[in-house]
Amino acid sequence: MPLIDKLRERISRAFYSHGLLCASYPIPIIILTALCILASCYPLLKLPLPGTGPVEYVTSVKDYSPPPLEPNPEDHSDQPDWYVGLPVAFIQQVLVKAVVSPWDKDFLAVDVFRSPLSRVFPLVEEIRNHVLRDKSQEKSLEDVCLQVTDLLPGLKKFRDKLPEHGCLLLSPANFWQNSQEQFSSDPDLIRTIHQHEPKTLQTSATLKDLLFGVPGKQSGVSLYNRKRIVSYTVTIALRRYNATFLDSLRSRLKRQHPSTNSSAASQHIVHVHFKEEIGIAELIPLVTTYIILFAYIYFSTRKIDLVKSKWGLALAAVVTVLSSLLMSVGLCTLFGLTPTLNGGEIFPYLVVVIGLENVLVLTKSVVSTPVDLEVKLRIAQGLRNESWFIMKNMATELGIILIGYFTLVPAIQEFCLFAVVGLVSDFFLQMFFFTTVLSIDIRRMELADLNKRIPAEACIPPPKPGAKRYDRQPTLRPATPHTITLQSLRNLRLPKRLRLVYFFARTRLAQRIIMAGTVVWIGILVYTDPAGLRNYLTVHVTEQSPLGGAVMPPIPVPVLSASNPHGPLSAVFPTGSSQLLENQSQRDSKEVIDSLSSRIWEESHPEDKSKERAAKIEDKAHTQVTWGAEDEETWRKLSFRHWPTLFSYYNITLAKKYISILPMIPVTLYLTPQEVSDARHPQEAQHSHPYLQREGKPDEAWARVEAKGAEKPTENQTPADVTLYKVAALGLASGIFLVLFFFLLYRLLCPKNYGQNGVSHGRRKKGDLPCDDYGYSPPETEIVPLVLRGHHMDIECLASDKMLLVSCCLAGQIRVWDAQSGDCLTIIPKPSLRRESSGVFEYQDNWEPTPECKYNPEESLENGYQLKRRTLHPPLFSDQPDLTSLIDTNFSEQPANEESGARQRLSCIKQESPPIGYDFSSLVQKVYEEHEVSSFGSFPLVLSPAPYGQCQLSSGRRSQTPAGCVDGSCARRKSSTEETTGYCNGSSSPAPSWTDSFESSVWSLGLQGNLIVVGRSNGNLEVWDAIEGSLRCSNCDGQSGITSLVFLNHRVVVARLNGSMDFYCLDSQKSSNQLQFRGAPNRSNVPSSPLYSTDDVIGCQRTHTVACAHRKPITALKAAAGRLVTGSQDHTVRIYRLEDACCLFTLQGHSGGITAIYIDETMVLASGGQDGAICLWDVLTGSRVSHMFGHRGDVTSLLCTASCVISSGLDDVISIWDRSTAIKLYSIQQDLGCGSSLGLISDNLLVTGGLGCVSFWDVGYGDLLQTVYLGKCEDSQPARHILVLDNSAIVCDFGSELSLVYVPSVLEKLD
């Protein structure tokens, strides 16, 4: 077993055991969880309610004056309301950057910061002693600074570190009481600086941050400081603003400690206003969010039937989320983490989102389990189903947090610390508290259901003991199977609120969005934060990488002389470092001219150049101090609690007040190696290791390179620095990481078969509860369908038009049904005929056939018997007019005539009527004049082809009896109320008779109005009257079987087996009488197709013939929107114009024969073939729009909606595709043999067939809405074909029977 599977199995087993534990002992677990919550929230008792971050307002330094005490109502500027009166203090910071230059390889790691820190004492003394001498007075720092008194009583440990009873001036010198002697005698500076640091994690202001004035990681006080630059500030709090004094102090410090490449462009004063710490109003959005959360969960769970207490579950969810927030903040406070502006405000809302989604996931998983299981098993199974996904999401989130923490960006690290605590606490509460509460609620639901099911007798108290009575007790009724009705079920489609809930629970969209947003946020901060990766790489490359190298000459950079750092600038040309271009642009013109002149002088004196290079062996590398825009507002990198914490030590509150932060004063200090040696403590040489000894001593490499450069001064050598290679490797690693990250994100968000094989859940089976994604099994019901019986063989063809349904079986019998009542209206041929195995009809009695053609009309007409097959020969009197319409065939009250058929017929014609009888002369004369060919029993109807292939039959009154076949001739049997005459114009060549048609199979069928068009295997095309069962027209020109036909309006197009097509037009010689067939009695449905009267003479005129439409048999034929589309075994699809049979396009795109075609009035064309592919085509241009592979066999049927394409195949799979993107949305696995049984009731409702059942699906969502079983399922047959009627009914083909099923009304309303 693979490692992943083993891990997954162990996780599932652990969650299953945990679910059993929570459901078995709910009360102890809830009590234990409550104690854990209270213990975690205990630190919150000492924490005030969180306020909001400070607000800033910026003004210019030039002409600054403090605002008035009261706001001016006439002032319409944009200054805030709080900007009134003097601030609590004006903060002036002197930012110091100190570096040892040049650096010697023998220096210790502690030398990086000991000597720079030693310079803070004279700097502080210089600031304290600065005096501004004016004409009339002198002003010192004591006159303008903020005077403070004692510290708070609880800060005794800070008494010797923070100033008291004097100016509020802070610097690193406060660690040693501003005494340089204590500093020099301190053997361990790191221990002294960190002795008051909290042992726990801390993000708020610490003593080190207060005194250094910069974040601890940027101070450079570390044994592994590769930059060798130490930064700290001297912070001065001023009581009033004196611009003259501050300008003089700035000028003096710049003069004494010049910062040559510092722009100091900031000329603004930032006023920072701090809101009230306890802000109840600030908590209103968060409280509102939790109220909305409670209401949303309640209204969502109202639609979940398996939850007993909706209020209780919603309350438990809110308590879970709120407890998770409180536990997170409490644990963070316990470990020294306090919410800050960046992480604290959004954190409660992230907890709400993540907690809500986890609640939905657990609820959905548990209520999706089978209801017949025990409660603890349901809880355990629900947890097991979601265990892998919960742990996978948890691991992904922790991995992202871990990566973010090691970016070393303070804001990201702080957020990651909060996120870890929040995720762990939320996971704890979800697993222990909410799961246990959910088990209690489901157990209450189960008990309530049991109480409802207890019979009334069980509630009767037991009788009192007394005399035994032996009366007969009534037997209990056995449990009988019941039918689930739609009224007792929940809504077939889930409500929108639950669909949204389960959508978030199924996809975990919120957590994935948060994870993606966190990654993007971390990436942005890494590359934009002043302390981020971008600045690190810039400084690192600037300090150690030779830009240009051998490609371009090194640009001279002026630096301070090592012997005299305070003296004038001298041009020194370091070969091991280059200056940033922006720093070079900041030099004055004099420096550039001096550099260029020095360069020219060096080129003209190569001997001096060699000497200078030899001297640089000792001066290994100068570290240049750079100043950037991020240094102008270093205070922004501090915690927003920095200033309130500082002033709170002196009992000064900043709530509802503001402070003004002045532009900083830059100071650059360069320390010589001699100063480093003088400041070193004797004990440090024994305990400290050389600088960067563990990192490979890069300075030795520099020394070797410089030595080689001195030996070969004529060669342009570049120091062997690998920083560029490190940067390149880091960039390559970042690129690989991004590629892998986006790949994993793709695999996480997108399914494995995205764009090819549909969604990840694959095929949906009815047995596997296809609605499991939403937690519900589809409702099932059983109804008694309207069964249409009558066929003795399997049904092969089905057709419908409005209220009529036509079916044809393999025996060639055509039946016309009423789609509303299920009554059989007409049988073609008549029900008294049946076909032998050879295909010819015979009598159903036992009279013996004779080898000769003899016929007794009275006997046949009276008894309605069928003839057996006899030898075909020309009938008698075939050249005489048919006078059968003159015979009264109502023999029910007359004795049968025993004479022979031929003599009786002749005597009936020649017999003169009695004087008192009826005169038939006028009627006989009319018959002779019309020259109609007899269609009576033994007289053949010669259907010779006309010059244009026209053949006509005229029917008289309405037929009541079916037609029969005698001796190979087609005839119709009449009653007294009917007379029929036949007419066929054309040549005298014999044509096939009706019996020939009956002996051939029906290959295709079409119905429109009251006309049925039949295409037979022998090539004959017949038009029948669906109501009377009479043949209205027949065309016998075809020599090849009709594989398919289209009956559209008055046009009939037939496709033949040899690949040809014939276009016919149906017309009538009389005006059409648009009768309205109303189906069965008491029906009022009117079909839209034209209905012809029995008096109409229907003509079938062939208008066009396409001799070679395809090179192989035509297997598919569809017509719509004036276009005719054909598909053939030659792998092509052709589009014809219906009106003139003109071929417009030949479409090639299949590698197999075409098996299915779909086209509608919107000219949407789809084709499917034996290769299992589906192609979508543009009918107007003939181009292929999309190509989809979705079946392992032939595509049997195609359907299209406005947004989907539905295909089915021989693999018994129904695939639903997105029409615009050609992406498979989902698949439906059908029962064996039911792959092609599907139909569209509407664009949103699909019906499919199964073993003795039909199922209704939501096309848009793939939900199984309902399964309807048609009778018993033990001996059920597969539904092979489904035909959707216009009256909200469907017809299912179950072998030789048809089942008429009406769509449930709930589904109609749903659609």
Swiss-Prot record:
<keyword id="KW-0677">Repeat</keyword>
<dbReference type="GO" id="GO:0090110">
    <property type="term" value="P:COPII-coated vesicle cargo loading"/>
</dbReference>
<dbReference type="GO" id="GO:0012507">
    <property type="term" value="C:ER to Golgi transport vesicle membrane"/>
</dbReference>
<keyword id="KW-0812">Transmembrane</keyword>
<dbReference type="InterPro" id="IPR030225">
    <property type="entry name" value="SCAP"/>
</dbReference>
<keyword id="KW-0968">Cytoplasmic vesicle</keyword>
<dbReference type="GO" id="GO:0032933">
    <property type="term" value="P:SREBP signaling pathway"/>
</dbReference>
<protein>
    <recommendedName>
        <fullName>Sterol regulatory element-binding protein cleavage-activating protein</fullName>
    </recommendedName>
</protein>
<feature type="topological domain" description="Cytoplasmic">
    <location>
        <begin position="443"/>
        <end position="512"/>
    </location>
</feature>
<feature type="topological domain" description="Lumenal">
    <location>
        <position position="421"/>
    </location>
</feature>
<keyword id="KW-0443">Lipid metabolism</keyword>
<feature type="repeat" description="WD 6">
    <location>
        <begin position="1190"/>
        <end position="1227"/>
    </location>
</feature>
<feature type="topological domain" description="Cytoplasmic">
    <location>
        <begin position="745"/>
        <end position="1311"/>
    </location>
</feature>
<keyword id="KW-0472">Membrane</keyword>
<keyword id="KW-1133">Transmembrane helix</keyword>
<feature type="topological domain" description="Lumenal">
    <location>
        <begin position="40"/>
        <end position="277"/>
    </location>
</feature>
<feature type="glycosylation site" description="N-linked (GlcNAc...) asparagine">
    <location>
        <position position="261"/>
    </location>
</feature>
<keyword id="KW-0853">WD repeat</keyword>
<feature type="topological domain" description="Cytoplasmic">
    <location>
        <begin position="1"/>
        <end position="18"/>
    </location>
</feature>
<comment type="subunit">
    <text>Membrane region forms a homotetramer. Component of the SCAP-SREBP complex (composed of SCAP and srebf1/srebp1 or srebf2/srebp2). Forms a ternary complex with insig1 or insig2 through its transmembrane domains at high sterol concentrations. Interacts with the SEC23-SEC24 complex.</text>
</comment>
<dbReference type="GO" id="GO:0005789">
    <property type="term" value="C:endoplasmic reticulum membrane"/>
</dbReference>
<feature type="repeat" description="WD 7">
    <location>
        <begin position="1230"/>
        <end position="1267"/>
    </location>
</feature>
<feature type="short sequence motif" description="ER export signal">
    <location>
        <begin position="445"/>
        <end position="450"/>
    </location>
</feature>
<feature type="transmembrane region" description="Helical; Name=3">
    <location>
        <begin position="311"/>
        <end position="331"/>
    </location>
</feature>
<keyword id="KW-0153">Cholesterol metabolism</keyword>
<feature type="topological domain" description="Lumenal">
    <location>
        <begin position="534"/>
        <end position="723"/>
    </location>
</feature>
<dbReference type="GO" id="GO:0000139">
    <property type="term" value="C:Golgi membrane"/>
</dbReference>
<feature type="domain" description="SSD">
    <location>
        <begin position="282"/>
        <end position="440"/>
    </location>
</feature>
<dbReference type="Pfam" id="PF12349">
    <property type="entry name" value="Sterol-sensing"/>
</dbReference>
<comment type="similarity">
    <text>Belongs to the WD repeat SCAP family.</text>
</comment>
<feature type="transmembrane region" description="Helical; Name=6">
    <location>
        <begin position="422"/>
        <end position="442"/>
    </location>
</feature>
<feature type="transmembrane region" description="Helical; Name=8">
    <location>
        <begin position="724"/>
        <end position="744"/>
    </location>
</feature>
<keyword id="KW-0446">Lipid-binding</keyword>
<dbReference type="InterPro" id="IPR015943">
    <property type="entry name" value="WD40/YVTN_repeat-like_dom_sf"/>
</dbReference>
<feature type="topological domain" description="Cytoplasmic">
    <location>
        <begin position="364"/>
        <end position="399"/>
    </location>
</feature>
<feature type="glycosylation site" description="N-linked (GlcNAc...) asparagine">
    <location>
        <position position="583"/>
    </location>
</feature>
<feature type="glycosylation site" description="N-linked (GlcNAc...) asparagine">
    <location>
        <position position="242"/>
    </location>
</feature>
<feature type="repeat" description="WD 3">
    <location>
        <begin position="1037"/>
        <end position="1076"/>
    </location>
</feature>
<dbReference type="GO" id="GO:0032936">
    <property type="term" value="C:SREBP-SCAP complex"/>
</dbReference>
<dbReference type="InterPro" id="IPR053958">
    <property type="entry name" value="HMGCR/SNAP/NPC1-like_SSD"/>
</dbReference>
<dbReference type="GO" id="GO:0045540">
    <property type="term" value="P:regulation of cholesterol biosynthetic process"/>
</dbReference>
<keyword id="KW-1207">Sterol metabolism</keyword>
